[in-house]
Structures are given as C-alpha cells and as structure tokens.
C-alpha cells in the first residue's frame, strides 16, 4: 500500500492542529487530588479543627453478679441436648452482633478492646437473656493485629471473664479459619481447640460457596471440643423469582440437609448481602424447618432497609 502511494507517513506533518493542545479542565480530578492531599498530608498553614463529641452515656452497672444464662445451660446439657432445648423455647432467641459484625460492617472492624471492655460486664448483667454475643472471628482477628496493634486472644479472654453467663460466638470461615487462604487441617483443628479453650462456645461455620468439603473439618473439631456447631448456608439470588433457578428454594433445602447430616447443631441462614426479602425469609425458614430437625438462626443485613421485616416474616 505504501508502494502504491495510498499510504504515507506525513499525517503529523500535514496536521499541525494536533499540537494545539487544549488546557486541561478536569476540575473533578483536581478536586479529588486536593482532597487526597489534605487527607494524607494535612492542612497547609491551617489549624485543623478539633472535633467535639457528645458525652458518652454508659449503661447502668447493675449490682451483684450476672444472672445465669445460656452459657450455664450449655454446660449443663451439652451441645446435643442444648440444641433440643432451643427448639423447645416458646420465644425467639436473639444474638447481639455489636462486638463483631456491627463494627466490621459499619467502620472496618475498628472497635477497640478497651472500648468493649468498658461495657462488657454491664451487658452481662443487663442482658442476661441474650442467646449469644457474636464477638470474635471474621475480620476482627487480623484487624486487631494489623491495624489496632492488639492481641485478639486477650480480647477473647476479656470477654469470657466479664461475660460468664452468655454464650460467646465467633464466625469461622471453614478451611480458611480467620484468614484469607486455605489452611492445613491440623491448623484449623488447633485453632478451634484454642478458641474454645479461651472462651468461644458457638462456632458459626460457613463457606462462601456453600462447599461442605471446606467445612467438614471445622464441624468435626467443634463437636470434638464439645462446642456448638452452628453451620451456615450463604444466601444469594432471589428464591421468589422463578427465572433465577440456580439458587432456588430446592437448592437451599438440599444444602440445609447436607449441613444437618454433617453434624450441625444449629442451621444458620447467612444473608451477608441483605438480599433476603420478607416473603423469601418466610418461605425459606418454613422449608428448612420441614426439612431438618434443627434450630434455625437467621442473620441478615439492613442494606436494603428490609431486614426488620424479613426477621418478622421469618419468625412467623
């Protein structure tokens, strides 16, 4: 083509307008750069304002020792009979997630041990009827080390000392334990042993892909340690939409049956993205109660604004 003269290399020479560059007017990027600079380097020549905080109103510290609770009931009955005891209760049981998933979701797991220690004993006395306190596992373990420069084991021992009457619960990522890779079976087993020894009573075990193979070792070791294996199925999709037939009601019922057969003491529904609609919660809990003879524990998130209604329908 060059030999025939159809193409040449004179385009730039013949188009001088290419060098008439317009001044950049990307104000959005400039603003972002300024914000980033101030965030990282602080104000140049300006005194940063000191934020003012409202005084903290501490919950009342009731006199006397905490009343006996679910911790004593588990120690008395053991995991198997304790599971049956849960099913016999005429009222709904509640887990408080303030010390784990709440601050993990709201501000990157940055709640410090010292702040929780100030109220732990008051919670034990003021809320002795709670089923459990989710206070460990998930991202709390690595964040304590990497960002807060704290010892998560000391935090757990503090909880056990100050809350002797309520079950302490953690989130365990199956073969990933509290890390972000797969660990050898003996590592997972030893971690569970030490977690139980230092205070954990309920292990909520899950795998992001609902793979039972990734949860079997954890379930087995939790049972070996005489603790409660609350095994979770992760919810996604929309079981109310017939067009979404991969993760439908039959899929979750089948997963629930597999988890029950694997040794779960409690079956959890882990709605980590807050996708479970109210009517879907009713349908799913109803189907699982018909399929397995286990307590059902629902965990969801409020991102959609539907969580309280989903809980209400699940209770129905």
Regions inferred by a protein language model and the residue ranges of each:
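Non-catalytic terminal accessory/regulatory regions of metabolic enzymes
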Residues: 1-178, 183-185, 193-196
């Amino acid at each position: 083509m060059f030999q025939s003269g159809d193409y040449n290399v004179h385009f730039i020479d013949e188009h001088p307008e290419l060098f008439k560059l317009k001044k950049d007017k990307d104000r959005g990027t400039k603003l972002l750069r300024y914000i980033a600079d101030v965030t990282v380097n602080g104000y140049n020549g300006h005194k940063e304002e000191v934020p003012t905080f409202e005084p903290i109103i501490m919950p009342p510290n009731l006199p006397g020792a905490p009343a006996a609770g679910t911790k004593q009931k588990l120690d008395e009955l053991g995991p198997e009979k304790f599971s049956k005891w849960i099913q016999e209760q005429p009222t709904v049981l509640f887990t408080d997630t303030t010390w784990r998933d709440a601050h993990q979701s709201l501000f990157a797991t940055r709640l410090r041990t010292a702040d929780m220690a100030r109220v732990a004993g008051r919670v034990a006395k003021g809320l002795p009827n709670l089923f459990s306190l989710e206070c460990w596992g998930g991202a709390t373990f690595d964040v304590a080390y990497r960002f807060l420069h704290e010892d998560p084991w000391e935090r757990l021992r503090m909880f056990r000392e100050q809350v002797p009457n309520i079950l302490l619960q953690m989130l365990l990522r199956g073969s990933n334990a509290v890390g972000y890779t797969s660990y050898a079976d003996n590592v997972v087993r030893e971690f569970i042993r030490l977690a139980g020894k230092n205070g954990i009573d309920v292990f909520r075990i899950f795998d992001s892909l609902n793979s039972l193979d990734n949860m079997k070792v954890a379930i087995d070791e939790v049972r070996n340690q005489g603790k409660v294996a609350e095994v979770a199925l992760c919810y996604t999709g929309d079981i109310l939409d017939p067009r979404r037939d991969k993760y439908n009601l039959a899929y979750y019922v089948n997963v629930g049956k597999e988890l029950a057969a694997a040794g779960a003491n409690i079956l959890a529904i882990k709605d980590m993205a807050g996708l479970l609609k109210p009517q879907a919660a009713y349908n799913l809990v109803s189907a699982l109660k018909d399929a397995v003879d286990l307590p059902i524990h629902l965990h969801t998130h409020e991102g959609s604004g539907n969580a309280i209604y989903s809980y209400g329908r699940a209770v129905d």
